[in-house]
From Swiss-Prot:
Source species taxonomy: Eukaryota, Metazoa, Chordata, Craniata, Vertebrata
Biased composition (Basic and acidic residues): 1-15
Chain positions found as Phosphoserine: S659
Name of the protein in its database record: ATP-dependent translocase ABCB1
Sites of Phosphotyrosine modification: Y641
All residue ranges annotated as the ABC transporter domain in the record: 391-627, 1033-1271
Residues binding ATP 2, per UniProt: G1068, S1069, S1070, G1071, C1072, G1073, K1074, S1075
Compositionally biased spans, kind Polar residues: 640-652
Organism the protein comes from: Mus musculus (Mouse)
Glycan-bearing residues: N73, N91, N96, N103
Regulation: Translocase activity is inhibited by verapamil and is sensitive to energy depletion. C1orf115 regulates drug efflux through modulation of ABCB1 localization and activity.
């Protein structure tokens, strides 16, 4: 359905299969969860809390209408007393015994009524606490379960589901949408029942006290209910659209932040901002429409309410004058109905919150309810006692779910005997990796059977199957924990001795032991702090500790240097003994000893045999071997020593912040455990120390909408003043009946006052509409602006900011999703209500001082107590909000890591481990929610009960003032009405305290990010922009340490020079500083000492954007964006519109055009999240095309051909050789054959240049370079 299609991220078009499915589903799905469905995760205790909370809310809702009974009787007492007092005052000049008796009896009667008020207040104190705290407790418990269930559901989905769903949205749903559910099913439900009960009790009391008048007023009530119901329905629809748009924006943000180095290197910040802004604009427009709809509904409701007042008093007057009712009975009926209808008005924010929650829950519950066809948590399925390891693929056909038109396997037949090693060879994208994925049952074949020991793997228990398989993939993923913990992901019960044994076998022991903290070293997000070779060896160790029956090696040694590869290959050869092994390798020298080599072509196996047999057949394998042999004159099929092995202090990392653009120094992962704890505590200290911003600072963010805010404030002030004006009119009507006027005068006065009510209704319609519309629009613009500004500021930061663990993708996307909506919580509609309530209270107090200052002074003492309750509540909740925010960021980080690395988690069968980690991270917010429930309950009940106590004091003292002839009852009523409505408004305002508390915390974080200016400012317009760039690069005495590891030197006085048009090759052992050279040239960091020059100008003097625009980079494991192939290639140059002809030309140069042209959607084919729909070789060639379309002056190649098969590599290498012509080029490569023609080869060791010269010169020196070449020759 379109609802789903809107959630698919970047591209507007989707795969045709999904499109067809969408239309079909549109009719089947509803956009909101059912009312009772919202509480599907409530257990008996939650239900008990909700039942008791509802009972308390019902009692609470009944107490206020009961108060009106007391009030009616009290009014009759007053009017009778005043009627007897006035003639006495008129007729006597001196003291009168009748007057004294009347006065004393009035005071006695009022004392009794005061006790009633106090008793009702005490009841409210208890039930209001129970109502709020129990509903908050129940909500906190359910949200805790929903978060866990949702995360479990995500972990339980099959890989095919992730292929057709935008994973970027899932984190937004885990934060923003779940918090919307929390808002909707907590205390607001209690308030809803309270309001409904007040409505019902009000009408019941109205009927009992005076059914005639009640029926007349009721004539208007259905219209009020109808407008509310219609509004709620429209609101749900708008809310869904708004959530979809924000989820899409969240997906964009996550994708961009996860690939931040790629975005920065290609200057894509503005393009990404525009893409993000497009989704925000959509959400804003929906929000404004929602505000307009809501405003019209509220305006109509108030118009109808005031019209009913006019009708009530007009008809009530007739009933009093005909002696059917007393004035007290009229007021009892009127106020009971008034409270009932007003309580319907109070339903609005509660209905809105619940409607929002229902909309948010729809997608979440849909994912929870989705039953995967491959269920990794299922206990069903066969679990054989022993596995021999005989594998068979029989007539297997397969298409990926996201590209159903593209056939990958077209009838694959393959047998692997127990203990055999079978090598799969063939061109990139022919189906080799797909075979490995089907073996793990990440997907099921469309036709045919995959079997183990003759058993169809679909009948075997999924978890059992995956646990007997060890996988090492081409792009290994490590998790943000220690090296030891990463290896333990292979098998949970593994001992430290077994870990050490595995890392020795994987040739990782030496580099680990050289680290200050050895196995306790943190590897960073996605292993970003290690070089590719180090990551690969840890991944191999992780596979070996599983002691698997079946070993799947997909380019397992591609990231290793020559020396490491030889040792690791030997370890893998040893590990293969007694195991069934499937190997995929582009370097054919690593598979020549395989028992069977299977040649793939077009999704089927076209030849099988051992190396010698296939060489004699002279088919596909022979052709690949010959191509590779010709290409590798120095070291056939091998890497050069020197990119990624041991303690890499600077290597161009394959997975940097999940953006494999630049290899980061291993030393930046050198955390002691206590160091980690220290930094975490520092993080907390930093968060705590952020000063909470003032309301005016938050308002300043909305200042450009001042015309809207001004109109909104004026309308809110008018709406606030209408209540005290109502008090004047109301007191005058009561006053009419306490005077001894004739009937006709009374009728005329009452008719006039009734007309005033109608005028007030018309004014309210206009002012409530403009109040809602202007504040609503300003609030939506604010939300959009804040999200945009924060995202823009994030993209502005330098790389060192992203290096900080607290700025992980998960944390940043969580902040983006939740902070902006929290700030809106202090603005928009809530600000309107607060302004209105302040105006209400302020005007009420001023009027009261004019008409009865003595009584007002008493009330002015009481009101601060109500306000104090609100302030205490806000302070306490602010502290809780800060703790919640920090802890939910940690949860968000875990969730993001799990979602983004889902394939690895599934292969390792570690879904439950991540669930446990996620559940543990939710404990602090859960405990805080439990505490918060009681805090909110106590403060809410206090502010509510204080109103009743203030009534008791008001009327007791009022009776005394009337008895002493210091005030008339008319004025007592005026002061009472003005202050009652003002106090109710103050109490209502305090209920916004939790939202305002959250808003202040969020605003503080937002402003800190927005105001942060980085040292290397990507947005800066300063700096030189030479008209001509030749491409002379010079490093002069450069010293550099990474900002997060200031005590570990990386470059120690490096000096080198490359002239324009020259190719410079950097070689050396891992950790020597090769990659740091490239990072400093990209100006991701600045050197601590020494200088980097470009054409004789220090690069610090050059404009950053201009500098990067002239550099083109191709990395070992490139990141692609979830958009079309054409858009990915065009991303190479974001400064202009790249024509389709240029895209095609670049694709042809990168040897990818033919493949693209064979796809149904050709260049419009989406590549999936991070390019997952493509093979490694296809991704690499698209990345090369992306760099070539840029036409850079300086080309930076980090293992640019490492992921390619032999045939592709040869053609691409030729393309790169051609691309290098006339350009300065810096190359880092394992295969020395690819750099032997370089103009200058520089050997770096320990951050300094040790050797430099041409290939022949360095061979003649017989130094380090010569040793590398010899090592390569032995491997050939």
């Amino acid at each position: 359905m379109e609802f789903e299609e809107n959630l698919k991220g970047r591209a507007d078009k989707n795969f045709s299969k999904m499109g067809k499915k969408s239309k079909k589903e549109k009719k089947e799905k509803k956009p909101a969860v059912g009312v009772f469905g919202m509480f599907r995760y409530a257990d008996w205790l939650d239900k008990l809390c909700m039942i008791l909370g509802t009972l308390a809310a019902i009692i609470h809702g009944t107490l206020l209408p009961l108060l009106m009974l007391v009030f009616g009787n009290m009014t009759d007492s007053f009017t009778k007393a005043e009627a007897s007092i006035l003639p006495s005052i008129t007729n006597q000049s001196g003291p009168n015994s009748t007057l004294i008796i009347s006065n004393s009896s009035l005071e006695e009667e009022m004392a009794i009524y005061a006790y009633y008020y106090t008793g009702i207040g005490a009841g409210v104190l208890i039930v209001a606490y129970i109502q709020v705290s129990l509903w908050c407790l129940a909500a906190g418990r359910q949200i805790h379960k929903i978060r866990q269930k949702f995360f479990h559901a995500i972990m339980n989905q099959e890989i095919g589901w992730f292929d057709v769903h935008d994973v970027g949205e899932l984190n937004t749903r885990l934060t923003d949408d779940v918090s919307k559910i929390n808002d909707g099913i907590g205390d607001k439900i209690g308030m809803f029942f309270q309001s409904i009960t007040t409505f019902l009790a009000g009408f019941i009391i109205g009927f009992i006290s005076g059914w005639k008048l009640t029926l007349v007023i009721l004539a208007v009530s259905p219209l009020i209910g109808l407008s509310s119901a219609l509004w709620a329905k429209v609101l749900t629809s708008f809310t869904n659209k708004e959530l979809q748009a924000y989820a899409k924006a969240g997906a964009v943000a996550e994708e961009v932040l996860a690939a931040i180095r790629t975005v920065i290197a290609f200057g894509g910040q503005q393009k990404e901002l525009e893409r993000y802004n497009k989704n925000l604009e959509e959400a804003k427009n929906v929000g404004i429409k929602k505000a307009i709809t809501a405003s019209i509904s509220i305006g109509i409701a108030y118009l109808l309410v005031y019209a009913s007042y006019a009708l009530a008093f007009w008809y009530g007057t007739s009933l009093v004058l005909s002696n059917e009712y007393s004035i007290g009975e009229v007021l009892t009926v009127f106020f009971s109905i008034l409270l009932g209808t007003f309580s319907i008005g109070h339903l609005a924010p509660n209905i809105e919150a619940f409607a929002n929650a229902r909309g948010a829950a729809f997608e979440i519950f849909k994912i929870i309810d989705n039953e995967p066809s491959i269920d990794s948590f299922s206990t069903k399925g066969y679990k054989p006692d022993s596995i021999m390891g005989n594998l068979e693929f029989k007539n297997v056909h397969f298409n990926y779910p996201s590209r159903s038109e593209v056939q990958i396997l077209k009838g694959l037949n393959l047998k692997v005997k127990s203990g055999q090693t079978v090598a799969l060879v063939g061109n990139s994208g022919c189906g080799k990796s797909t075979t490995v994925q089907l073996m793990q049952r990440l997907y099921d074949p469309l036709e045919g059977v995959v079997s183990i020991d003759g058993q169809d793997i679909r009948t075997i228990n999924v978890r059992y199957l995956r646990e007997i398989i060890g996988v090492v993939s081409q792009e290994p993923v490590l998790f943000a924990t220690t090296i030891a913990e990463n290896i333990r992901y292979g098998r949970e019960d593994v001992t430290m001795d077994e870990i050490e044994k595995a890392v020795k076998e994987a040739n990782a022991y030496d580099f680990i032991m050289k680290l200050p903290h050895q196995f306790d070293t943190l590897v960073g997000e996605r292993g970003a702090q290690l070089s590719g070779g180090q990551k690969q060896r840890i991944a191999i160790a992780r596979a070996l500790v599983r002691n698997p029956k079946i070993l799947l090696l997909d380019e397992a040694t591609s990231a290793l240097d020559t020396e490491s590869e030889a040792v690791v290959q030997a370890a893998l050869d040893k590990a293969r003994e007694g195991r069934t092994t499937i190997v995929i390798a582009h370097r054919l020298s690593t598979v020549r000893n395989a028992d069977v080599i299977a040649g793939f072509d077009g999704g089927v196996i076209v030849e099988q045999g051992n190396h010698d047999e296939l060489m004699r057949e002279k088919g596909i394998y022979f052709k690949l071997v010959m191509t590779q042999t010709r290409g590798n004159e120095i070291e056939p099929g091998n890497n050069a020593y020197g990119s990624q092995s041991d303690t890499d202090a600077s290597e161009l990392t394959s997975e940097e912040s999940k953006s494999p653009l630049i290899r980061r120094s291993i030393y930046r992962s050198v955390h002691r455990k206590q160091d980690q704890e220290r930094r975490l505590s520092m993080k907390e200290a930093v968060d705590e120390d952020v000063p909470l911003v003032s309301f005016w600072r938050i308002l300043n963010l909305n200042l450009s909408e001042w015309p809207y805010l001004l109109v909104g404030v004026l309308c809110a002030v008018i709406n606030g003043c209408i209540q005290p004006v109502f008090a004047i009119v109301f007191s005058r009507i009561v006053g009419v009946f306490s005077r001894d006027d004739d009937h006709e005068t009374k009728r005329q006065n009452c008719n006039l006052f009734s007309l005033f009510f109608l005028v007030m209704g018309l004014i309210s319609f206009v002012t409530y509409f403009f109040q809602g519309f202007t504040f609503g629009k300003a609030g939506e613009i604010l939300t959009k602006r804040v999200r945009y500004m924060v995202f823009k500021s994030m993209l502005r930061q330098d790389i060192s900011w992203f290096d900080d663990h607290k700025n992980s993708t998960g944390s940043l996307t969580t902040r983006l999703a939740s902070d902006a909506s929290s700030v809106k919580g202090a603005m928009g509609a809530r600000l309107a209500v607060v302004t209105q309530n302040v105006a209400n209270l302020g005007t009420g107090v001023i009027l009261s001082l004019v008409y009865g200052w003595q009584l007002t002074l008493l009330l002015v003492v009481i009101i601060p107590l109500i306000v104090l309750g609100g302030i205490i509540e806000m302070k306490l909740l602010s502290g809780q909000a800060l703790k919640d925010k920090k802890q939910l960021e940690i949860s968000g980080k875990i969730a993001t890591e799990a979602i983004e690395n889902f394939r690895t988690i599934v292969s390792l069968t570690r879904e439950q481990k991540f669930e446990t980690m996620y559940a543990q991270s939710l404990q602090v917010p859960y405990r805080n929610a439990m505490k918060k429930a009681h805090v909110f309950g106590i403060t809410f009940s206090f502010t509510q009960a204080m109103m009743y106590f203030s009534y008791a004091a008001c009327f007791r003292f009022g009776a005394y003032l009337v008895a002493q002839q210091l005030m008339t009852f008319e004025n007592v009523m005026l002061v009472f009405s003005a202050v009652v409505f003002g106090a109710m408004a103050a109490g209502n305002t305090s209920s916004f305290a939790p939202d305002y508390a959250k808003a202040k915390v969020s605003a503080s974080h937002i402003i800190r990010i927005i105001e942060k200016t980085p040292e290397i400012d990507s947005y800066s317009t300063e700096g030189l922009k030479p008209t001509l760039l030749e491409g002379n690069v010079k490093f002069n005495g450069v010293q550099f340490n990474y900002p997060t590891r200031p005590n570990i030197p990386v470059l120690q006085g490096l000096s080198l020079e490359v002239k324009k048009g020259q190719t410079l090759a950097l070689v050396g052992s891992s950790g020597c500083g090769k990659s740091t050279v490239v990072q400093l040239l990209e100006r991701f960091y600045d050197p601590m000492a020494g200088s980097v020059f470009l054409d004789g100008k220090e690069i610090k003097q050059l404009n950053v954007q201009w500098l990067r625009a002239h550099l083109g980079i191709v990395s070992q494991e490139p990141i692609l964006f979830d958009c079309s192939i054409a858009e990915n290639i065009a991303y190479g140059d974001n400064s202009r519109a790249v024509s389709h002809e240029e895209i095609v030309r670049a694709a042809k140069e990168a040897n990818i055009h033919q493949f693209i042209d064979s796809l149904p959607d050709k260049y419009n084919t989406r590549v999936g999240d991070k390019g997952t729909q493509l093979s490694g070789g296809q991704k690499q060639r698209i990345a090369i095309a992306r760099a070539l379309v840029r036409q850079p002056h300086i080309l930076l190649l980090d293992e640019a051909t490492s992921a390619l098969d032999t045939e592709s590599e040869k053609v691409v290498q030729e393309a790169l050789d051609k691309a290098r012509e006339g350009r300065t080029c810096i190359v880092i490569a394992h295969r020395l054959s690819t750099i032997q023609n370089a103009d200058l080869i520089v050997v770096i060791e320990n951050g300094k240049v040790k050797e430099h010269g041409t290939h022949q010169q360095l061979l003649a020196q017989k130094g380090i370079y010569f040793s590398m070449v010899q090592a390569g020759a032995k491997r050939s």
